[in-house]
């Protein structure tokens, strides 16, 4: 009966007239009446559907589809990153895309408001993961793992204002490398910076600089400048914006929005404009205010040792001690770092690319203990590669240069000039597949040879093997080079070996 409410007025009138007919007419009209009911219901449903406003097909804000062309470039970037992680002995792992909300809250400071909460499903409050670090710490605590070197590639979600033109999204991929365990100071930290340098150099993105600081130095700086301890995290979040905002704007935010005394903000300004190498570390040891703070001295001592290891790794010239680097996430406890691309003169026709940091990380010795019932700590240090921003840079450069990419890795195309040769082509392509050769054919019984050859040229397939009646009689197969258009007949039993030889030489 619930369907009757969907019927328009005319349908009701028609039904009532059928129902009120004399009894002797009801049997003959039963089938017709049932048909009219079904037709009326269907008409009502279709009308309601047609009255809905036009639905715009699009991806949600801050997300995007990746075409086959995009995926080729992305996979090359990820292959380089992952091979570097493996070269340094990391093991791969994964965690759920969503966690208990309680797992993620109070780990990100002011950024906690950017988490995506999921609708309650069966009593558990859940959120999409904001990064890959907190789930890793939860994994270590839950499984009582005390030592691990891992890498993790996966998507994360943040409700921030997306800037698609600069490679910033609400859904994006992160590539993380972390070292967990109790080790001698600064050795794992130095390796993380070495990995950053290897990846950024391998991607050939141009000159880059890795800024380093220490959260103990940041907190010590706040203390000697007169920042109330209750405002440390809030002011740290403001300082973290110096890569996007001018000092006067950051100062305005600290004073007007966060209630910091102007003279305190000015003292901070004297420090955050300092950057340099190991000589700046030595200079800060002599600073009359900073040298009186125990936390800051501990951080400076570790940075001095870190620069010694970086010199041995041959990358000290890529590292800058930068007192403006704060890293707003709450879980950092020691060394922090962030890689930025240096702006170089662009080539003719190129637009300057300003994408912010392309990699970042640091030490978080207390995060695992937040999940352990007894508060047992597992010291950790790690890094995260900003794949989306790197992909944006590579994509823009390819557009400027007019570069095209192959979307498949097909090596050989199986073709025929004659009709009714589908069975022979299927046998031949199966032989190639079984030999590990990447091969394709058209899914038609009688394709034209010109169509097949044109497909190879348009998709970049280097070799064509051609089989026809003449080749079948003579026990040979023709191999055609798509680039030179040269053809040569090869004995059928030697075909696989000849293809493998040609592919190895190309």
Swiss-Prot record:
Residue range of the transit peptide? 1-33
Q: Name one GO molecular function term.
A: RNA binding
Residue positions where Phosphoserine is found in the record: 67
Task: Tell me its EC number(s), please.
Answer: 6.1.1.21
Q: A biological process (GO) annotation for this entry?
A: histidyl-tRNA aminoacylation
Is rRNA-binding one of the keywords? Answer: no
Residues annotated to bind L-histidine: 131-133, 158, 174, 178, 327, 331-332
Annotated Gene Ontology cellular components are: cytosol; mitochondrion
Q: Which residues carry this modification: N6-acetyllysine?
A: 444
One Pfam short name: tRNA-synt_His
The set of disulfide-linked cysteines is: none
InterPro entries named among the record's database cross-references = aa-tRNA-synth_II, aa-tRNA-synth_II/BPL/LPL, Anticodon-bd, Anticodon-bd_dom_sf, His-tRNA-ligase, HisRS-like_core, HisRS/HisZ, HisRS_anticodon
Name where it's found.
Answer: Mitochondrion
Q: What NCBIfam families does the entry give?
A: hisS (TIGR00442)
Quaternary structure, per UniProt, is:
Homodimer.
Q: What does this protein do?
A: Mitochondrial aminoacyl-tRNA synthetase that catalyzes the ATP-dependent ligation of histidine to the 3'-end of its cognate tRNA, via the formation of an aminoacyl-adenylate intermediate (His-AMP).
Q: Which family does it belong to?
A: Belongs to the class-II aminoacyl-tRNA synthetase family.
The name on file for this protein is Histidine--tRNA ligase, mitochondrial
Organism of provenance? Pongo abelii
Annotated gene: HARS2
